[in-house]
Amino acid sequence: QKKSLLVTPMKYGVISGGKKIRSTIIFDTGRLFNIKYKKLLSICAAVECIHSYSLIHDDLPCMDNDSIRRGKPATHKKFGEATAVLAGSSLLTLAFEIISRENNYLTLKQKNEIISLLANFSGHTGIAGGQELDLKFENKNKNINQIIDMQRKKTGKLFNFCLHAVGIVANKNKKEKKLLESLGEDIGLLFQLADDFLDRKGSKKLVG
């Protein structure tokens, strides 16, 4: 992988700033269940890859057409549109490879459940589906339920995953994992509200 020309734009998309709030939530939730941080590292890395992929694609001219991300030039502005598409797609697939690796302190059953969950929440029923709704709603009147549904998918689903995945590692039962997932969704919606407020009131250079 180090020989790939895509490594540099991939690193740029992941490491270049950002609050890393999703990883923080994973670690903090894990602490509540006395889970050693090393058991959560691969999940955090995967989440940051998924989140960064979604931002890279979200900024593309065919999507939201944003030139600034995290106070710096968006990936497509720095490396070109085609490279940004490939870097984002590579981060998406890298996330699943990270979870499937040996010696990441997860059992095979946990890996399978986490991979299935992440695929569900990052694809057409999650992040990608939410982005499609966002594009379809552009310049159209939409009611509050449509907006919430879009935000649940586009932003909330990855927060759902963060808490649910910790529940998997903690060997919680189905009901407990669903409760964690529901809490994650609420956190995601609150985060999106705060983010939207910053987009309107904050400095574009600082907020990105």
Predicted regions and their residues:
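Mg2+-dependent prenyl diphosphate-binding active-site environment of isoprenoid biosynthetic enzymes
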Residues: 2-208
